Amino acid sequence: AFSQLNLSADLVWSGGYSPVEEPTEGPDGWWENNWTSGEAAKAGWDLWSTNEEAKAWSDKFSNVLVCGDDQIYRYEGYFQAPESSSLKNWSSFVAAEMSCQYNEGKSFTELKSNIKDFRAWLMENSTGEEFSFGAYIPTGEDSADFWWYNWHGDFEAMARGNANWEKNGKEMQAKFDDTATCT
């Protein structure tokens, strides 16, 4: 329903995340909007806050989702999954997220190198199922240096992908571990 509002051509994707386990603190879900730029995001939110159709949508779905502007986080996404294996259907998926801190002397430079190697690893070692990944780099205050996300079509695909990673990804995991500590 949200995507049907068609408020901005600069809004690339919107979707919600609902945790599998109830969180002990913080929000019980997250809404993500991907914009073409930071400027487009600001303009989009300015439009949203004054748009009657958007207000009507918010009121209609207030029993499902209420978003406050006190918890808006800004990131630059770095997405390099091979197109051939990327998740195609973003209407329903499962995700795993990790909060990451760079190890001493490491930075986005090493992370980009790891991602390039991981992309090549995926092209040779994937399960053949759709899979996407990304790094979200904070552009403001954040508890993490970056957030790592893995997206799978469903929990079964995630289990198969994780088993494949455990079996075949040890060398690649060591490269990631040298760059950052993720939890």
Where in this protein do the model-derived segments appear?
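Short S/T/G/P-rich N-terminal loop/turn motif that feeds into the first structured element of a domain
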Residues: 1-183
